[in-house]
From Swiss-Prot:
It comes from Streptomyces avermitilis (strain ATCC 31267 / DSM 46492 / JCM 5070 / NBRC 14893 / NCIMB 12804 / NRRL 8165 / MA-4680). GO terms for molecular function: metal ion binding; rRNA binding; structural constituent of ribosome. Binds 1 zinc ion per subunit. The lineage of its organism: Bacteria, Bacillati, Actinomycetota, Actinomycetes, Kitasatosporales. Binds the 23S rRNA. One of its GO terms (cellular component) is ribosome. Zn(2+) binds at C16, C18, C38, C41. The gene is rpmE. The keyword Zinc applies. This is Large ribosomal subunit protein bL31.
Length: 73
């Protein structure tokens, strides 16, 4: 490898919105990374499914087409 052409490789603190944090190494100069999901809270790793706001879509569909249209399927 050539000298003095590679970015600085520093310890980086990664923190998730769930509160979990861990240390890794990265070329990010700030030394901190904020993530929305991590292995502590991601549904694939936890086995739990997050409920998204799909209830509004279903209610809007039923209001528009009625419950009979949904029951025919």
């Amino acid at each position: 490898m050539k000298r003095d052409i590679h970015p600085e490789y520093v310890e980086t603190q990664v923190s998730c919105t769930c509160g979990a944090s861990f240390t890794t190494r990265s070329t990010i100069s700030s030394g901190t990374v904020r993530a929305e999901v991590c292995s502590e809270c991601h549904p694939f790793y936890t086995g739990k499914q997050k409920i998204l706001d799909t209830g509004g879509r279903v209610a809007r569909f039923e209001a528009r087409f009625g419950k009979a249209a949904a029951a025919k399927k």
